[in-house]
């Protein structure tokens, strides 16, 4: 029942929210937001287990699939679509599904989150299999669409995890691993796009970033698999080569082109003074890890 969920409780500190000045509202929100990172910190051991599972999927050429409804679904899609430009993944490696389909990203689709079968249809459409990891996201921890997706994922042998913002969440029963970040009452009662949404975003940031580090998408703290899809990213790519190798900007730009705009290969070429083909071979042998290739 909704009344049992901490995310649905009234916040004792904001009973007079409608009487506060704008500054008081903002200060109240900021005060509540400060508690979110601390709530996430309590779940780091569970998040670590999720990351290890995702890395295993990636190593077996499996995928990471997020499912959610409303804000939770949008956050999953947001994390997924940032992976190709940031980490050089294809658009299949990390995917996000929202109840009601992509049109629900910009406009609510009434009743979609209440239908378990819609998630099964979505996951069947991509040929979900035992190599994949499915992460169900629901602030309340009880969304039928997410439960349906997790049930189907388990039925095909995929790894499963859940992210919710209430303890003993219903969706936790249907996942191998559970991340339950208890964010408590919102300043605006039941508006889980606030603290709960912030907590979910922090957890998703952790999962995708740490998983990509785990499969060699990062060298030192540089995103060496960045895709140069616009001028800003072309410049960033050259700067990454400068930072990684200590070469001048001019040398970095030269090797960037010699390496056919492959930042990893350019770094290996500069540091080992080798040709493009040899750099690719070294990276292949090192499974994409620049440090091992060197």
Curated annotation (Swiss-Prot):
Its EC number is 4.2.1.126. It is an enzyme of class 4 (lyase). Pfam families: GKRP_SIS_N. Gene3D superfamilies: 1.10.8.1080, Glucose-6-phosphate isomerase like protein, domain 1. It comes from the Bacteria. InterPro entries: Etherase_MurQ, Glucokinase_regulatory_CS, MURQ/GCKR, SIS_dom, SIS_dom_sf. Residues 54-217 form the SIS domain. GO terms for biological process: amino sugar catabolic process; N-acetylmuramic acid catabolic process; peptidoglycan turnover. It catalyses: N-acetyl-D-muramate 6-phosphate + H2O = N-acetyl-D-glucosamine 6-phosphate + (R)-lactate. Keywords: Carbohydrate metabolism, Lyase. The active site is at 82 (proton donor), 113. Pathway: Amino-sugar metabolism; N-acetylmuramate degradation. GO terms for molecular function: carbohydrate derivative binding; carbon-oxygen lyase activity; ether hydrolase activity. A lyase-type mechanism (elimination/hydration) is suggested for the cleavage of the lactyl ether bond of MurNAc 6-phosphate, with the formation of an alpha,beta-unsaturated aldehyde intermediate with (E)-stereochemistry, followed by the syn addition of water to give product. Homodimer. Belongs to the GCKR-like family. MurNAc-6-P etherase subfamily. Specifically catalyzes the cleavage of the D-lactyl ether substituent of MurNAc 6-phosphate, producing GlcNAc 6-phosphate and D-lactate. This is N-acetylmuramic acid 6-phosphate etherase.
